[in-house]
UniProtKB/Swiss-Prot annotation:
This is Methylenetetrahydrofolate--tRNA-(uracil-5-)-methyltransferase TrmFO. Its cofactor is FAD. It comes from the Bacteria. The keyword Methyltransferase applies.
Amino acid sequence: MNIHNIAIIGGGLSGCECALTLAKFGFSVTLFEQKPQLFSPAHNTPLLAELVCSNSLRSNELTTGIGLLKQELRELNSPLMAIADTCRVPAGKALAVDRELFSKQVTQLIESHPKIHLIREEVSSLSTSFLEKYDRIIVATGPLASPNISNSLSTLIGDKYLYFYDAIAPIVTADSIDMSIAFWGSRYEEQGEGDYLNCPMSYEEYQIFYSSLLKGEKVTNSKVEKEIHFEGCMPIEALAERGEKTLLFGPFKPVGLINPHTGLRPYAVLQLRPENLNKSMLNLVGCQTKLTYPAQDTIFRLVPGLSNVEFVRFGSMHRNTYINSPKILTDQLALRNFPCIHLAGQITGVEGYVESIACGLWVSILLLALSKDKKILRPPKTCALGGLLEHISCPSKQFQPSNIHFGLVPEPTEKIKKKERKEWYAQRARIDFYHWLNNELIHIM
């Protein structure tokens, strides 16, 4: 098939992964990015691959779905995973990155690549005249697609968008935190300083914080959009509304932590994670929120150690838009009625940084196979990548976005003890992925 010239709309994680991978494969790539001409409500810098919700790419453990997915991407030579690994900051068993350094490195690599032409302007319409300029189009506009491109895409697919809201956690300066109260430490680690700064709370202090959280003023949504929260980025106040102890079994859980100032386990703990290598800025883990700025300024200061904290960025809410992929897309992740238009990233219904990278990489592999008139089977659904792709391909009564977890892969056919199940999932995934890598992917590379 004659595929040489490819346009990508959107310079986020998925779009950048597509651009770098396709350029490596030898395609001529035109990457459109609307910044700095136009910013979404959640983006702040003109850099490509900007991380807006958190600087964490989550666990590196192979006994987790996300850890497996990252390892599979590394073995597929993902450009963005390679950059992330070089920009990592201490985060225990997780992979967190210096977000500015990460985005700068991605931007520099794309701007200097001879096979990539970066155009800094909004693509407002998927018109016939635009489509005719390229052999293939990849829409990787992310969950914050501009109204213009959203309306154009909606016209093409003839179906309404679904909406849910993502919340961003506040960031504070490290030197404004009271270290006579807070302490460094990671759960269950006895030695070393630890990768998280912990603010311990007594029962009484937690009650005051919890009560204020429930009463805090929230930002209201557009009246015409239904509010649907993604479970993995649930606003802290929405979690609190589920019950007094919900936070204690979630982001504020104290298990595995001992306060060195008292020698006791706190009743609750708010953890802060470094935003950069020198740990000068930290984000409030699990505190993504739609509280108004004044409410945040008051309520988060109730946490012990944060009474005089300096906010670098308050938390905020933004719309997340995605399509009903199983209904709209082919197995090539292309529109059923416009097969020259492919979709990649969070707009397809994958949720999360690594998942967006994975989707972009997979679309690139699909286009390589198409250009060689070859078919490629996607990885087995027992693998992390295969399970994620199965989710956005398999019809369901109410399709919702998802990040990768073991609930997306087939359950064991034999009886496995609960404590051994994650290890079993990981071993099965590794075996099946290697088999696919050496028996399927090798034929198109």
